[in-house]
Each structure stands twice: as structure tokens, then as C-alpha cells.
Regions:
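RNA/tRNA-interacting regions in translation and RNA-turnover enzymes
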Residues: 1-275
Length: 275
């Protein structure tokens, strides 16, 4: 029978190494589903064997993309990661848990596509963009303003804004730009980049802003962190509409769902589309 303590230690070491490759080197060695399986197994073992608590665990963190070359800034509100799922059954269970937590409320869900990019937090003070910060370790991240400010379509000022506003989103690279850059590198005999997400992650951490500008990045905004004064928004759908009013690049397609799907024929499928 496997030793749970040894398996926990092994999984923590494996996940920590994969976090380093993904967040700091932008060169993941395994795909997202394989990584999620490792993390799910570790979470299961930690829940079953709390006596083997060795301190910090990768199940309790969001990785860390900070590097020494950049100045770090503390997020006014932590940037947390979202749980994910690959099955409709887990999605239904999620809805059931929320129904038990809020038995007297009729819950409406906002459903939107997920862009596989690099998380970023934009800080606006009195309507002016003052800083762009990477997720980092969720508490503080790297100041990447010089590489984010030039992104086409990103407003450097917004009207009728709260005194302090953190806007959260994803920086990504379209497939056409990725293929253009890799084509040029191939012609020069240089190593090719693995995928658009890795190239976007590497681009925002370039020390030469001119080189970063030569690579076309895109950005999509979908959420709000700190907002001072508070109580500015009461629902995610309001955030979506206000971001659009402020001329932020947003996902135009999203849906409001009255409850989680309980039965569907054919079965619910989770799919993606190419950008």
C-alpha cells in the first residue's frame, strides 16, 4: 500500500517544479489537465491525512510569476485563482452546494468563455492608468506597466470612475501573431515558441519595452478587484456592462443562466474556440 506521507511530499515537489516552469519560465512541461490531476490528487490526500501538514502547500497558493528584474507591488485586493472542472457532474455539484448555502435565493449565473492568457491587474487612480501588475503570488506581483500600456485598445484613462479601481483581465496573443513570430524565428534558425500563452507570458516580462511592443499582444478585461469607494457594483453582469461603457476590451459573448443545468440531452459539453 502506498505511503500517503511520501506521496504527499512527492506531489508537492512535483507541483512546485511545474509551477516554476509555468509561471517563471513560461515553459510548462505538462498540459493543464495533467497538472490539474496532480493538484486534485494532492488536495484529496491532504484532506484525508491532515496529520501530514508540512507547512505551505501548492494547493493553498496560485503559483508565483515574480522575477527579480521587476519591482513588486502589492495588490489592494488579492488575485485568487478559480477552481475548474472538466465534467458536467462537478458543475452540477457546484450548483447544489451554492443552493444549500443560499436556500432562500434564486441564483443567476453569468457564463462566459475563458481566455487562456496571463492574468493582469490594472490600477486606475482618479480615472488614470497608473500601474499594471502581474498576478505574482496572488498578494503581490511584478510591475509590468511599460509592456502593458502600449497594448492596442487599452484605455489609459476612463471617465466617471471611482477614486481607485483595480480591473482584472487576461493578456493573450492571437494565433496569427504567434504564427508570424514563429515563422520569422524558423527562417532565422531560432528555437520556436511552444504556444501563444507561453509567448504572451514571456513578452510581458521582457526588459526591453521596444521588443515587447514589436509583438502584438491583446487584452480582455472581465473583473474588478479593489474599488474605492466600495459598493460600486452589485453583480458580475453590472461589471461587464460598466467595463464595456469604459471602452475596455471585453468578451462580447456571455450568458445569464437561471440555475445550473440539471439534465440535458445531448449531455453538456465543455468546449473552446480559437482566437
Amino acid at each position: 500500500m502506498p505511503d500517503p506521507q511520501k506521496e504527499i511530499a512527492k506531489l508537492r515537489a512535483q507541483i512546485t517544479e511545474h509551477d516554476r516552469l509555468y509561471y517563471k519560465d513560461a515553459q510548462p512541461a505538462i498540459d493543464d489537465q495533467a497538472y490539474d490531476r496532480l493538484k486534485a490528487r494532492l488536495a484529496e490526500l491532504e484532506s484525508t491525512h491532515p496529520e501530514f501538514d508540512f507547512g505551505e502547500s501548492p494547493t493553498q497558493s496560485v503559483g508565483d510569476d515574480r522575477i527579480e528584474a521587476f519591482e513588486s507591488y502589492r495588490h489592494r485586493k488579492p488575485m485568487l485563482s478559480l477552481d475548474n472542472t472538466y465534467s458536467s457532474e462537478e458543475l452540477i455539484e457546484f450548483g447544489q452546494r451554492l443552493n444549500k448555502r443560499f436556500p432562500d435565493q434564486s441564483l443567476t449565473y453569468l457564463v462566459e468563455p475563458k481566455i487562456d492568457g496571463v492574468a493582469v491587474s490594472l490600477t486606475y487612480e482618479n480615472g488614470a492608468l497608473v500601474r499594471a501588475v502581474s498576478r505574482g503570488n496572488g498578494v503581490e506581483g511584478d510591475d509590468i506597466t511599460q509592456n502593458v500600456r502600449p497594448i492596442k485598445g487599452l484605455p489609459v484613462s476612463i471617465a466617471d470612475a471611482p477614486a481607485v479601481l483595480e480591473v482584472r483581465g487576461e493578456i493573450y496573443m492571437r494565433h496569427e501573431e504567434f504564427e508570424r513570430i514563429n515563422g520569422a524565428r524558423e527562417a532565422e534558425g531560432q528555437p520556436l515558441y511552444a504556444n501563444p500563452r507561453n509567448l504572451a507570458a514571456g513578452t510581458i516580462k521582457l526588459l526591453d519595452p521596444a521588443e515587447a511592443r514589436s509583438r502584438k499582444l491583446d487584452i480582455v478585461l472581465y473583473g474588478v478587484g479593489a474599488c474605492e469607494p466600495g459598493n460600486y457594483f452589485s453583480a458580475q453582469s453590472e461589471i461587464q456592462q460598466k467595463l464595456k461603457d469604459w471602452n475596455f476590451p471585453v468578451l462580447e459573448k456571455y450568458w445569464l443562466a437561471e440555475g445550473i443545468i440539471k439534465k440535458q440531452s445531448p449531455p453538456l459539453s465543455l468546449s473552446c474556440f480559437k482566437i
